[in-house]
Amino acid sequence: PLRLVGSEMCIRDSMMDIAARSLKIKRNVITKLLNEGLYPYTKRYLGTFENHFSTIGLIGMNEVGLNANWLRADMSDPRTQEFTKEVLNHMRERLSDYQEQYGDLYNLEATPAESTTYRLAKHDRKRWPGIKTAGKPGDTPYYTNSSHLPVDYTVDIFDALDIQDELQTLY
């Protein structure tokens, strides 16, 4: 299996820790405001946020595959697909740990993140001019959503579904 080692794993886990902690803080603030009457309609219909998930996702796994020295291949390559499965499974395990740590529900979603994919790709291009992003050279850079195939990968939906099938069930 293709595994992250050392600093790459620490960076990924550190980013997840920040996201989980941030979501916990936001949940606490919103719950406090809800209980103090600032969201009366929400309070009436939901009552509480205890049964609601704090969601963590990822973007740009296609570009991770293109930029990773040990892969250099997009999501259509079985090695990149396998690496993506490992990352998603690891994220699921971490989310389970956060549920125990914080006492709230956490989930992994293939989140739509169009504006975020553009913003992060733009910043990354500035910092690392040679980085591979989605789109054509000279176009506005962006990352593909979650673990999606490149936008122009195929016109055959069944081909795309065959590749995405195992990945999408991990969200």
Question: PLM ranges: what are they?
Answer:
Residues 1-6, 10-11:
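Single conserved hydrophobic/aromatic residue that forms the stacking wall/gate
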Residues 12-59, 63-171:
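Acidic, glycine-enriched catalytic cores built around paired aspartates
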